[in-house]
């Protein structure tokens, strides 16, 4: 970041922390160690970017509102986390937030750094599937974590993330999301969110984890490609209204920080309980296909380690860590 942008970010931070009062040009000049005329020029540039700033003679400046578009500064204003999102890498257009997050993590990015984009051109889902990520219509976000966990536990972070997103969607939109094991969130049987967890690890320790999430927020049905139009949905389609993307991101980060702290202190039981509150098709018939066999079974929930719990072909409870699931089965 160049010196001018750094100064501008500090200026926004000062204004954002004092929205209920004016800050004199003299005070800003002293804190930022630049002239009052330079302060005035920065204010004019911020107004060009969409910031609404009120300036009054003998009183100073105060910020009235931030631009609608997402940026590092707009996200930090009103974000009340302790460590998550304190470093933000924001891009207007990007191939994938996962790619950038991996590179940032390899370069030493801190625990809690987030990568966010207005648009992804190569959005990444599970099993190398693509994830449709249009400009300014959704949340395309990756979180870098450096947890003190055994590598085999990293998959539990996917389930934790799913509970966080389900809680945010329910509490902020009043919609009724369900979590489809292991990583999708559905509303009325249509996908609104996908989660991808990747890591770099040694045999017994994790170097870093990158949790990526794509959330369809303000798309209309016609904005989806035809091949996914009947399977995908958005918060707007399901609720009939637009949603403030910045506000949703801030809630996600706040909820995630709390849930992650609880998980690191108490382990998986609270995640399991919350996950099963939102679990899709629990108690219902599903089709299961593994490399060895396929059968119909009742979905029982998730195990203490996050595995899918179902009945094997002989009616005995079994754990599945990887399987092809047919979710829409009908009992005969």
What are these regions (language model features)?
Residues 39, 97, 141, 184, ...:
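Residue-level signal for inorganic ion chemistry
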Residues 2-163, 167, 243:
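N-terminal lobe of the biotin/lipoate ligase/transferase fold
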Residues 62, 185-187:
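Short, active-site-adjacent cap segments at secondary-structure transitions
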Residues 87-88, 112-114, 139, 178, ...:
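Structural motif
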Residues 2-34, 48-49, 159-177, 187-332:
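Long, positively charged amphipathic alpha-helical accessory segments at protein N-termini or as interdomain linkers
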Residues 179-183:
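Alpha/beta catalytic cores of group-transfer enzymes, especially the acyltransferase/condensing modules
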């Amino acid at each position: 970041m160049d010196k001018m942008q750094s100064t501008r970010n500090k200026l926004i931070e000062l204004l954002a922390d004092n929205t209920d009062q004016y800050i004199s040009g003299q005070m800003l000049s002293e804190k930022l160690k630049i002239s009052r005329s330079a302060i005035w020029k920065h204010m004019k540039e911020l107004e060009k970017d969409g910031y609404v700033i009120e300036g009054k003679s003998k009183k100073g400046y105060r910020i009235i509102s931030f631009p609608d578009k997402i940026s590092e500064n707009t996200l930090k204003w009103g974000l009340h986390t302790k460590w998550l999102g304190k470093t933000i890498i924001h891009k207007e257009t990007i191939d994938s937030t996962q790619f950038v997050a991996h590179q940032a993590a390899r370069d030493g990015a801190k625990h809690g750094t987030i990568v966010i984009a207005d648009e992804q051109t190569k959005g990444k889902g599970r099993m190398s599937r693509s994830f449709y990520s249009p400009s300014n219509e959704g949340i395309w976000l990756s979180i870098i974590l450096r947890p003190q966990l055994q590598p085999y536990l990293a998959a539990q972070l996917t389930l934790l993330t799913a509970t966080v997103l389900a809680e945010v969607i329910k509490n902020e939109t009043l919609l009724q999301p369900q979590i489809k094991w292991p990583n999708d969130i559905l509303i009325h049987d249509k996908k609104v969110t996908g989660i991808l967890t990747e890591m770099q690890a040694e045999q017994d320790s994790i170097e870093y984890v990158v949790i990526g999430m794509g959330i369809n927020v303000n798309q209309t049905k016609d904005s989806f490609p035809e091949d996914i139009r009947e399977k995908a949905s958005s918060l707007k389609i399901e609720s009939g209204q637009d949603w403030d993307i910045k506000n949703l991101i801030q809630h996600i980060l706040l909820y995630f920080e709390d849930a992650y702290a609880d998980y690191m202190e108490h382990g998986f039981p609270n995640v399991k309980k919350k996950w099963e509150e939102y679990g899709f098709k629990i108690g219902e018939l599903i089709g299961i296909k593994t490399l060895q066999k396929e059968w119909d079974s009742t979905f029982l929930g998730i195990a203490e380690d996050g595995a899918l719990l179902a009945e094997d072909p002989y009616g005995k409870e079994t754990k599945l860590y990887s399987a092809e699931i047919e979710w829409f089965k009908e009992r005969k």
